[in-house]
Amino acid sequence: MMRVEISFSYGEKKALDGVDFSAREGRLLAVIGPNGSGKSTLLKCIAGILKPEGRIELDGKDITVLSPRARAKLVSYVPQSSLPEFDFTVEEFVEMGTYFTSGSVERALKEVGMWERRSESVLKLSGGEYQLVLIARALAQGGRVLLLDEPTSHLDVNNALEVMGLVRSLGRERIVVAVLHDLNLTLRYADDVLILKKGKVTWFGPTEELTPEVLQRVYGIKFEFVRGNSGTAVVPSL
């Protein structure tokens, strides 16, 4: 289990204020909230890119005191993606900048279904395929915690569903925390939801307990949940 109890400021501006939650293996945690609510900052604090006040515990041990290398072996981070700029093969791209061990790149690419395309240029990949390669690069580190910052933000519906299906499967043996902008994907794939607004936790709990009224208080828009054969959809209420 991962326990987070942190605050963080950019200068005098409080970006995270007493954020307190836990995440477990086998349960995908989605972090949602309005723009500027601190979602990306939260992931960067857990990943060790930013240094917050407080504690981040993994199995009861504070990982904020670890060296960057030791932290990277426990926590893997996939930032918001942009299109690739340089002509590397898929395998070369995964090997770049990661603390991987012998065989870990192959295992990671196989886990996301991209091993057979390891010799292809990343410049020729679709947006969804490139996102899978980014996830593989994080998996190659072998961390127990996987952080994903808006993994579907630039994808069409079909690619987004494919990526989120993979993300959910990865969480069976890992602690997975994903910032999501799509409320429908949140309801469909997340086991637990953490809602941030102005750097504070406004709601945290199992997805099945999330209500339209909670979302209205956060986003200032009336919603309703429409249940169908493919799951529950979130739609604005007129």
Each model region followed by its residue ranges:
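Conserved ABC ATPase "signature" region
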Residues: G103-R118, L123
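Catalytic Walker B motif of ABC-type/P-loop ATPase nucleotide-binding domains
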Residues: L146-E150
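Helix-to-loop junction immediately C-terminal to a conserved catalytic motif
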Residues: A47
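The feature captures the beta-strand-to-loop junction immediately N-terminal to the Walker
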Residues: I32-P34
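Conserved ABC transporter NBD signature motif
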Residues: G54-D62, R71
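ABC ATPase nucleotide-binding domains
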Residues: P212, V218-L238
